[in-house]
């Protein structure tokens, strides 16, 4: 929808409704840190992750921990860092979390810039993100085999969604 002052991209939301400013503030208060915002504080997200026994793959989908992470980014982010999705959040080292945050920022910014999810490194593919085919843009999500070791990609339910991972490369 495009109006004289505003535009809305309704591609993807499962629900859309007009709300009052007080409702917006209440909803926003429940959200975790958004890696795309300049004022995001990764320290707040780190505190939530480091204290949790919950699997990092589940924590990443919890919008009150880190806002904006969906299923594709979750799978490919963890694959890119070689972190198993079932690993408890509290088992991550601070350096791993910092790397996770920075990688997530990079992936999300590329997605915004090109209006599509791109988690693979365009330099490795040899194409700009805008020219990459869907199967070239993703690392592990809905893949058959691991691009590194060739092992069959495992998939199972985690946090209510299907996760994809290489059981050999992600530990």
Which residues fall in each region the model found?
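Structured catalytic/nucleic-acid-binding cores of DNA maintenance enzymes
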Residues: 1-171
